Amino acid sequence: DVYKRQVESSYNGGWYGQCKVIREYLPSTDLPALIENYLLINTDKNPMFVEIPVINNRLYTDPRKGVDGSYLIEMKIDRNGYFSIQPGDTLSFSAYITGYKKGQPALVINGQQEKLKRIEAVTSWMDNLVLETPDPIIDRMFAFSKIRACESIYETQGGPMHGPGGESYYAAIWANDQAEYINPYFPFTGYAVSYT
């Protein structure tokens, strides 16, 4: 599945019960956010009791390293409390990390809505400019390249820019890459952000 990353694990807590945890990791398609959706499934024959703490961690980045000074990084969980999960039932919740410039209002993230938006975006990229060769590995590599290309567009002071990434140079240009390879490719993806 090209639009989500899912990790599944099992937990046997002895007297506390058994459960399965499914975690999905995804970036927001239009917000400065990374989302983690959790499903906690009671695989035991007895009810399971779970406490989700209130989490609202905030930190500020070094103002000398930001274009606009210090940024606020916020980590939250959208659900908290004490829950009883019956055998076979599922408890779902989301955690997310967001980033803000000074003075920007806080975001309220709905993890399931973000997942649906991502599925829609990636599906549209996969439906456009499809490579079909005798080798399914090459076809899959090309499909993944569309995700990599479309998700490497960053908002800069000069407007949206495609960049190589690399953790230090997000708003940098590798001129030959942009001019020779990616810019002619973008209109065929159908992703309006890439060519407007």
Question: Residue locations for each model-derived region?
Answer:
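Substrate-binding groove/exosite segments of carbohydrate-active enzymes
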Residues: 123-195
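Extended acidic/polar, glycine-enriched regions
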Residues: 26-122
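Low-complexity, acidic Ser/Thr/Pro/Gly-rich terminal tails and inter-domain linkers that flank the onset
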Residues: 5, 10-29
